């Protein structure tokens, strides 16, 4: 069962969120038939969207993450509602790269680093709030 756990320090200065999203990631993989590298990238994006969406105060709000890194995976989109429920897709789910020399998946290489990371927050106003930044490494933490 997927869940989000949030905690706040006594002074309110530090907030943490922890997400377990195994079911959502397995469901996404069953739908999209992703390579190991593609599902790692999509799964990380789904977790990030879920954490950020859960922070929305508006009941009908949505949060959308878009990653377009110029790598072989193409674009990645993850959408969350205010309860942390997510859906997402990767443009080229079959794309895969060999593992890195340290044995880990090369998510950064598959995403690419020549592109943008965009977050859109739609809280039911006329236009959504949109913020973008250039990708640095292609890694999705």
Model-identified regions with their sequence ranges:
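Intrinsically disordered, low-complexity regions enriched in acidic/Ser/Thr/Pro/Gln residues
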Residues: 107-140
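N-terminal functional module of multi-domain proteins
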Residues: 1-120
